[in-house]
Amino acid sequence: MLRNGSLRQSLRTLDSFSLAPEDVLKTAIKTVEDYEGDNIDSNGEIKITRDAKEEVVNKVSIPQLYRYTTTLEKLLLFIGTLVAVITGAGLPLMSILQGKVSQAFINEQIVINNNGSTFLPTGQNYTKTDFEHDVMNVVWSYAAMTVGMWAAGQITVTCYLYVAEQMNNRLRREFVKSILRQEISWFDTNHSGTLATKLFDNLERVKEGTGDKIGMAFQYLSQFITGFIVAFTHSWQLTLVMLAVTPIQALCGFAIAKSMSTFAIRETLRYAKAGKVVEETISSIRTVVSLNGLRYELERYSTAVEEAKKAGVLKGLFLGISFGAMQASNFISFALAFYIGVGWVHDGSLNFGDMLTTFSSVMMGSMALGLAGPQLAVLGTAQGAASGIYEVLDRKPVIDSSSKAGRKDMKIKGDITVENVHFTYPSRPDVPILRGMNLRVNAGQTVALVGSSGCGKSTIISLLLRYYDVLKGKITIDGVDVRDINLEFLRKNVAVVSQEPALFNCTIEENISLGKEGITREEMVAACKMANAEKFIKTLPNGYNTLVGDRGTQLSGGQKQRIAIARALVRNPKILLLDEATSALDAESEGIVQQALDKAAKGRTTIIIAHRLSTIRNADLIISCKNGQVVEVGDHRALMAQQGLYYDLVTAQTFTDAVDSAAEGKFSRENSVARQTSEHEGLSRQASEMDDIMNRVRSSTIGSITNGPVIDEKEERIGKDALSRLKQELEENNAQKTNLFEILYHARPHALSLFIGMSTATIGGFIYPTYSVFFTSFMNVFAGNPADFLSQGHFWALMFLVLAAAQGICSFLMTFFMGIASESLTRDLRNKLFRNVLSQHIGFFDSPQNASGKISTRLATDVPNLRTAIDFRFSTVITTLVSMVAGIGLAFFYGWQMALLIIAILPIVAFGQYLRGRRFTGKNVKSASEFADSGKIAIEAIENVRTVQALAREDTFYENFCEKLDIPHKEAIKEAFIQGLSYGCASSVLYLLNTCAYRMGLALIITDPPTMQPMRVLRVMYAITISTSTLGFATSYFPEYAKATFAGGIIFGMLRKISKIDSLSLAGEKKKLYGKVIFKNVRFAYPERPEIEILKGLSFSVEPGQTLALVGPSGCGKSTVVALLERFYDTLGGEIFIDGSEIKTLNPEHTRSQIAIVSQEPTLFDCSIAENIIYGLDPSSVTMAQVEEAARLANIHNFIAELPEGFETRVGDRGTQLSGGQKQRIAIARALVRNPKILLLDEATSALDTESEKVVQEALDRAREGRTCIVIAHRLNTVMNADCIAVVSNGTIIEKGTHTQLMSEKGAYYKLTQKQMTEKK
């Protein structure tokens, strides 16, 4: 085969090993994703600090990278590498055959031109027999290489993929196991989101970087070395000449990788800011909507994606320059080699065959060097990604929950001693929490800890569970330092129930079973009865088999708390820790649960932390804490007699406890209004969500969302299941798979860029057919008139400079302008989609289909997937189509018989390309489904690691994780063999084409010499093969396009959704509110649980300036009233009026600007305290003095002032740097600074200690003056002064009136107050 065959082979090799430049882009993006979350400054801006840069380049060594492989796997790596090296060496050796067959065709053409004389100009006698012999030798060599390349592809890919999967499987298991054994202080600085990224993304990078691409890197390096050896041995002079251009080509190859890496990092880091906005906004959507923060979040997001777009355009610019330069340098090297080579052939110092062999070998070797760069970059990426993984794997926890060390032989009685304990949280070492704490609890005693927020009460529980170790002093149990007790043994003998319980996304039965191994059904039912949970569980459609949802969102707050209490009681622990265990229960439930807890406390040591003093008045010992120290100790009677801190706390509570319950569908629990439907539906939706997330994680590497290869029934079923889930998701979004025309329609604002890119791509499509004409014309010079040899040879050599200019310009323009169009489309769709999402009603977010993780995935991954449909890959498709049509036309012009043969063989080549795409497709579709369940388990365990460790269930979650990995791991091993088989086939079909084409060409020349002369055969062959050599570049587009059609269907479907309540709409009446509220026969059911009606004809009215208090049991509909007033939902029946206007006629945004809400569990944002207080307001309209005054009213100013950074202190993600009471007071300040006309208080003071509550309640009482206030509260002292108290039961009001009136009526309200007065006495 002639010289251009080696170039074509190089181009094919580029495609065959999936080294298209877009893969370099993917690799570069993956290099930085893991680090983006750690490089956000105090303003939420992305920064690249010195440490961040060092982290990015920190890599493990190659031996360390493979340290989790067995001896057998290392042997397979060696075999795979050896075959790859041999294969790489064989490719340049093929150039020798190309030189020989080229010389044979030239010789035969010379004989024909000499009118049958068999003597060549060199004097050699060259007969037909010689010609047949030379060509058939090459044909048989090609046939051998067809088989050899199939076997080589099979061995190399299978070995590497098998080893990569085995190693990755071990790493996944060990990584999760290592995470779960780390101490809690480590999690304070290593957020679950970052760990999840490492689990999914980093491990995928390691898998990719240790898989078949490394084999390809060895093959390219071998090809590079061998290529130059062959070149120097055939013509060292021409080799040196070509080396003048080769560095440029190699430089271009590395420039592509470098520019892609650099700008992909910039783009990804800039979008990290946007992704953070999305996650924070969607996960806290009720808070954002109620505070009118939507436009602020849209602006933040728009700014971030605009920055990402600019980085993407710069990426396209440098990519275009690099592509253009590389393509142009190829043709420049042709021109230089041919121009000089012609002279040497003319002088007799070089023959044509050696010239082409040298040229082919140098081109093949130099291109291999450039192609090895991206592959080695993938290895470098894996080394960098593995660094973060191995850092966790190698880290020895300070407190190792899996350690077997420590005493297990002791029979715990429950004596607890805290001796001179000093402690600060590692994440805030400058803020001391405990300052010499001393206390003693005797076995069997019930001890209560009371004090203001931040005094260190909950810290004692954390230290008892050994979440942390003390800095000074010690804590002992039965005289043994807790540090000397086996950790698992300790935690299995201690049970804790916290204020905000963590439930797992499984059934109620499975959640309770986590409390005790081997629990019987009888024990579970008994525990649920004690926790007052049995009754409500029986009312659920699936009883104990009811799925509780992500974080228990299918249950109300009180229901979640009772499940958590039951989970603790089944353990029958020696030590029971109750941290606000009944704070979320209504009075009726709390009374029963408290009795159960009182019974449970008998015979065991119990430590109670409670703001409601009625829950601790019967404690054996009450310990008052202040500023991290114990200030007084005694029982209730003794401490009341002392009239100290405890006395002050008690007297501040007129009534001690609850009337009401934790509201159904809590406002602050962002997804809590999602209701239980059925177990099957819940499972399918949750699986669908994880499928989507995992699919997006995997599809960010390579591949498409289509079926995998059909090998057997089981594999076919898995592929179909994955596709059916995707189709189901499209159906759930009322969408259909999109197409190119719809994508182009959405890109029409950028029509000019598209026109320039597509036009230059069309022009570029004629370059390769023109190249085939120029090249065969150059070859024909060697068989033509010797007198014109030199001039004609130089002429056609210089014509390649024309191609160089055309190719360079076209490559640059189409890459750059298609990049502009695609990046602009990405920006537009991200902004449109985010705006559309934020304009949806709250019921939209209650659906698991629209969980924050899914929406984040849509914006972060699906939109970029859509972009790939019209980026530079699309321009290569246009170029390829034009090139193929023009090339086939030329082939038929030169010789239709030969053209028909080659075209007949092309489907086999296309099938090979299909197998390659199919290979990647199957891999990614399976990844979407196979790892879904395991990923869900891992993420949930990591996010709730405190609960997991407190339950001593690390092994349970680890085993569940491993169990879910088994089937996908086995499928991946099978897939390694299938991929090797298909890859070997794809790698060999092109050699089969050459075998058949040269054999038929020889037959045509012999049988029909007048029509099919050697040069006509070559013109036909090169017209098609050169023109179709770009097919390899184009094939990388179609897997991406398949992803784009699925992603686009979902995205465009979402964009077509019109919200029932558009929070961003300008429509509706904008009136100044005075505060009159009327509910008239309102009926309502949550969208996710339409069969359960919450409000059943609720009616009431509140005059301007009045305060209405709503009390009643859990699930009666109190918090639903708040949600409807905020117009999170619309009623199913009845009407709601504000100042005489039906709420549906009012502009939602304007109305909410005059309403403020404070909920039980406030949501704070990861910004400063001041920014949290003024969130949703125009910063220019609020002075710092107003902020400080609001903080004073909320009794938080002094605390803020004592912080090192004051109001500029960042509160952490969801306010994690603050205690519950501190977060609540900031939320109250946030409400007060708004000066609302209507104030909604949903358990506004429930999280506050009594001392703080007294001051805050006074502030709220003052804040109520002159405005309408609707209060939901457990503590009756917060509602007794209300103008009207309404008792809600089963969705209706059963009695209402003032405190005095209701007390005189001696109804439901009276009974509750009497109960509390009895406790008070």
UniProtKB/Swiss-Prot annotation:
Tissue: Intestinal cells.
Binding site for ATP 2: 1112-1119
Pfam families the record matches: ABC_membrane (PF00664), ABC_tran (PF00005)
Mode of membrane association: Multi-pass membrane protein
Cross-referenced InterPro entries: AAA+_ATPase, ABC1_TM_dom, ABC1_TM_sf, ABC_transporter-like_ATP-bd, ABC_transporter-like_CS, P-loop_NTPase, Type_1_exporter
GO molecular function, one term: efflux transmembrane transporter activity
GO CC annotations on file: apical plasma membrane; membrane
Binding residues for ATP 1: 451-458
Protein name: Multidrug resistance protein pgp-1
